[in-house]
Amino acid sequence: MTFLYTARGSYDKTYEETGMSWVHYIEWSKLTHLTELVSLDGMLNEILVEPDYENPDDWNYIQTIGQYQTDFFTTPEFVFKRMIYKDKFNLLTVVVEPNIDCKDIKIDNYEFVGYELLDQDFNISALTNCGGFDETFQPTDLTDKGLIYDFEKAYDVKKRLLENNPEEHHADTNVIAVWRHITIGR
């Protein structure tokens, strides 16, 4: 497994920046049980890492899969070097398409928070930013952070999303395991 890194803005009831307010998001998404959103969706949890695309060395740290930039990076040092600093943020370690259950994998100073399902462009979360796929999963299938905690369930939802919505671009997803740093950004 390849561990990758990113930093994302926090999104919870204290969110006061431009964009959709937390209250409006909860009403729209119907995810009333969320306490915060720890997502890889760049529209909801903004990407805080800004690589210098003109610098050839930066491309050594930018993770691409196929033709897509993932907004994941190969080292935490690069994330800190190119990060837009905020008082509160999510420093994340991720694994794209893990082949084993990750909840018992221990990473120093990180806690496993669940599995995200991002579309093939690595932009939009099928779990929290598509208005719901009620034929495939229910809001109660998600944790209070908007992720799926169970490995088998994540891959089952991935499979059924595409079966039930073959024409929907955001239903063709990548399963991504997510760990969050327990002190940095908290």
Name each model feature, range by range:
Residues 1-29, 37-40, 49, 55-62, ...:
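Short aromatic-glycine-(Arg/Gly/Cys) micro-motifs in beta-strand/loop hairpins
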